[in-house]
């Protein structure tokens, strides 16, 4: 049922419970606390549309038989005039469950709601005015984005859309880890290529990156090419293979630009890119360390500076500054999260790989140790597990482009139908290939809970049948578009006929099930936002597509009689809108033809 209907029914049941309690206890116990009214959809459709266990909750405190209580609650409910528009029938099941059947009109109301709200259907302003910073991808600028980054990008962008649908002002942020040992390895790798070396040659650095992209960076550097990230200053290659600092700057700018291209092909945008290096140049890391020392949260031992993370629940204290004077991985992270707090983001969510689990307690301990008002549990985390790529029944572990892993660009190209092994820049691929590949990759990577490992099957992504989940959902949308076009063409009809259509002919089991599924969408979005679980939207879309196919296969839509024809078209039009809305939440297109 729709949220407003659910609220009304909860209020009616609450009033009924109050009447029953009043009759049982009178005013003798003013401290008696009424149980919360919880409405659920029965797992078995034959049991009704809504179930409530409030009678079972009341039985013990009232010392009454739960079935008898349920009967009294139902009697009080149906006696209220407002219930007549919602409740068609009520029955008591088992030890005292209240099962309610909703009126056909209350189920049909979702169609009018969808028409009235259009693309806004499902959205809510319940979190209006609240700001949230969502950090995701945050790759090192040392190579192309891999499939793990792809999962973060898909999850993060979808979650941002879901949160925005609930009224949040969402700030999307990418944190570039551009300071550290890996950046040094990138520089010496590019320098080695610039000097004519390749992996396996004598003199090839042991820690060097072996992917072909390093050769591309070295070539463009020596050719004096100019590169720039979307938010960065242009950097021109100096053509000097001995200038390691110039090589480093060029390589970082080159790979940031490449990652920008990957994200553009993936349809992901950020509001801000934050550079780790700025934390050092602006003195934020030193300031944070000094503040922790002043707060008594650190101690010196064996030449290293330790943070008392055990004070905040960690299993042991952690080294902050090593004996060589460099900082461990989590120290700039603490400084970075201080900037998030100082920028006014009281709600922060980080999407990271599960290999970052160990840093959570350290970062939170550092933030708590500063005593600047940051609440415990700040920031929130969504941790995702690894992605395995399969093709032709075999795991794909490497690509020519990256050398040691499958890239996001590989997945987009392969899932769009490009020939495996081809090296084509996203801007040179046709738009249909990019869209098809992007849709498949995004939907697939969101279609499982983040904390479960995911097997990405290229062969499945290319299938054009109901085995392919994104095809199954998109085909439902395209099929409806085809029927709507045929309706307009054959009968000279227009969409203007639909909002005021008589919906009473929608009385079949399949029609009722489809309308109930449509009405669930607002709750699905609210749940996805509350639980930071965008996969719930993907699950829902598959269920909605299934209900549509069941309805479409059971009932002819374009029948001769106008009333049932228009009613069924109205139901299809509402279903099309909700499919489009849900796909948009995931960043997936809703094609009108397939």
Swiss-Prot record:
<keyword id="KW-0547">Nucleotide-binding</keyword>
<dbReference type="InterPro" id="IPR005148">
    <property type="entry name" value="Arg-tRNA-synth_N"/>
</dbReference>
<dbReference type="InterPro" id="IPR001278">
    <property type="entry name" value="Arg-tRNA-ligase"/>
</dbReference>
<comment type="similarity">
    <text>Belongs to the class-I aminoacyl-tRNA synthetase family.</text>
</comment>
<protein>
    <recommendedName>
        <fullName>Arginine--tRNA ligase</fullName>
        <ecNumber>6.1.1.19</ecNumber>
    </recommendedName>
</protein>
<comment type="subunit">
    <text>Monomer.</text>
</comment>
<dbReference type="InterPro" id="IPR008909">
    <property type="entry name" value="DALR_anticod-bd"/>
</dbReference>
<dbReference type="InterPro" id="IPR036695">
    <property type="entry name" value="Arg-tRNA-synth_N_sf"/>
</dbReference>
<dbReference type="InterPro" id="IPR035684">
    <property type="entry name" value="ArgRS_core"/>
</dbReference>
<dbReference type="InterPro" id="IPR014729">
    <property type="entry name" value="Rossmann-like_a/b/a_fold"/>
</dbReference>
<dbReference type="Pfam" id="PF05746">
    <property type="entry name" value="DALR_1"/>
</dbReference>
<keyword id="KW-0436">Ligase</keyword>
<dbReference type="GO" id="GO:0005737">
    <property type="term" value="C:cytoplasm"/>
</dbReference>
<dbReference type="GO" id="GO:0005524">
    <property type="term" value="F:ATP binding"/>
</dbReference>
<keyword id="KW-0030">Aminoacyl-tRNA synthetase</keyword>
<keyword id="KW-0067">ATP-binding</keyword>
<dbReference type="Pfam" id="PF03485">
    <property type="entry name" value="Arg_tRNA_synt_N"/>
</dbReference>
<keyword id="KW-0963">Cytoplasm</keyword>
<dbReference type="InterPro" id="IPR001412">
    <property type="entry name" value="aa-tRNA-synth_I_CS"/>
</dbReference>
<dbReference type="GO" id="GO:0004814">
    <property type="term" value="F:arginine-tRNA ligase activity"/>
</dbReference>
<keyword id="KW-0648">Protein biosynthesis</keyword>
<dbReference type="GO" id="GO:0006420">
    <property type="term" value="P:arginyl-tRNA aminoacylation"/>
</dbReference>
<dbReference type="InterPro" id="IPR009080">
    <property type="entry name" value="tRNAsynth_Ia_anticodon-bd"/>
</dbReference>
<dbReference type="Pfam" id="PF00750">
    <property type="entry name" value="tRNA-synt_1d"/>
</dbReference>
<feature type="short sequence motif" description="'HIGH' region">
    <location>
        <begin position="139"/>
        <end position="149"/>
    </location>
</feature>
